[in-house]
């Protein structure tokens, strides 16, 4: 009888260990994979004013599409686009190399103040060039003159490479087939800008 009991006890202890195993594993917490934007938001062109630059307003000039070419120095996200101008205008974000439209939004009348409109978050890559530009439509423009510290300049984690504009009444989500000027270093017009949140 004893010979039969010993194997039975061994078998039961083996089953008990197997049953206990999932209970042991259940105490481990899963890793969180949800990412959130925790970096500090940056507005590169607006922050250029902290270096002593100033804005000049031009209420009745330019029917151009005007903005700047920029390069993030770290990976991150563009969460808003807009700028400093007067009157409701459309601001757009493109990838420079292929002209892909990344965002287009109507910015409510800033009345010559810095105003940014929400867009669907756009992930941007360090070292890749992008363009932000606003259709001025003949009114409410402004410019910044880079007197001694000409472009390219770095503000936070963004390098503004050059200012650019397309002359004529250009207001389209289609990337311009050419820029009238895209390598100006002493002025930027518009004034278009982005809100950039670096990855952390």
Q: What name fits each language-model region?
A:
Residues 122-134:
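Noncatalytic modules at the cell exterior or secretory-pathway interfaces
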Residues 114-121:
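Exposed aromatic-hydrophobic patches
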